[in-house]
């Protein structure tokens, strides 16, 4: 989605002459082909470390999110509208780990694209679509948590399975409708024809974005982000007020046990806190990348390659974060994972196992 170069001159002849000069001293992606891209490989030590780091992220994204999806879809106790949203979010992150991260790993470490022009475009479409799909899911989840915390007793009648299904459908359709035509129609490259021609070489996969679509991308990121920040600030205020009210009631009545409403409020606040951490992790991962994209689009792609690689892999690693967050905060997820890993979910009636502590 950007130019993979440290300093980009906008003159095509200077690019070609520089590439020819580099080709005489550096390796090529395809040694026996004309117009092969220049390859600058890492030495064996750093190369091995990078493969280990990037590969671990891809495996964690695939396996961790697969655990989340399996847990929610298999165990009946987890069949709720809110959890279906979480499972759909895990599906988007799972697809990032499966269709994007392994191929980006090879490109980042080897400096070449070995998977063909067709999958180069598909890879970029997957990248854009699935990542925006995650963002839209998180936005809807934040709204769901706001409803649950603000009035937990009527929440089940407001956020139903039908509403959850509409949120999931909207998230997937909008991200796919935006991502795929954007890349396949070449709309993102309009006005950059000379740049695209200069960058075209065998073993490359650079799809630059013009200023118009960089701004559209940023707006698609900014609007849900503002919604989430507004909603979670309200959730924080409501949760704090509820906690103060419950504490006052306990002091006044000296009750040893909690009321049903107190328990529901406490549970919903914990869920909101956990998913709030997931949202914060997403925003911290994505914001530096979007800021860099805007800077590059308007200042001529000045970001050094290694800085861009760091930013994009922070984004990719976000797809691996949510299962770790769930594992840390949710005992039911740890128990479900143990049942899946040990194969106990294959037993008869395993879907009815109680995952929640008494």
Curated annotation (Swiss-Prot):
Membrane topology according to the record: Multi-pass membrane protein
Residues with glycosylation annotation: 34
Gene Ontology process terms (BP): G protein-coupled receptor signaling pathway
InterPro entries named among the record's database cross-references: GPCR_Rhodpsn, GPCR_Rhodpsn_7TM, TAAR, TAAR_fam
Superkingdom of this protein's organism: Eukaryota
Alphabetical keyword list: Cell membrane, Disulfide bond, G-protein coupled receptor, Glycoprotein, Membrane, Receptor, Transducer, Transmembrane, Transmembrane helix
Residue ranges crossing the lipid bilayer per the database entry: 48-68, 84-104, 123-143, 167-187, 213-233, 275-295, 310-333
GO cellular component, one term: plasma membrane
Keyword Cytoplasm: no
Classification via Pfam families: 7tm_1 (PF00001)
Domain free text: In addition to the well known disulfide bond common to G-protein coupled receptor 1 family, trace amine-associated receptors (TAARs) contain an unique disulfide bond (Cys-37-Cys-201) connecting the N-terminus to the extracellular Loop 2 (ECL2), which is required for agonist-induced receptor activation.
Family: Belongs to the G-protein coupled receptor 1 family.
Gene Ontology molecular function terms on file: trace-amine receptor activity
Major localization class: membrane
Subcellular compartments: Cell membrane
The protein's role, per its UniProt record: Olfactory receptor specific for N,N-dimethylalkylamines trace amines, such as N,N-dimethylcyclohexylamine. Trace amine compounds are enriched in animal body fluids and act on trace amine-associated receptors (TAARs) to elicit both intraspecific and interspecific innate behaviors. Ligand-binding causes a conformation change that triggers signaling via G(s)-class of G alpha proteins (GNAL or GNAS).
Cystines in this chain: 37-201, 120-205
Cited SMART domains: 7TM_GPCR_Srsx
Extracellular side: 1-47, 105-122, 188-212, 296-309
Protein's recorded name: Trace amine-associated receptor 7d
Source organism of this protein record: Rattus norvegicus
Positions on the Cytoplasmic side per record topology: 69-83, 144-166, 234-274, 334-358
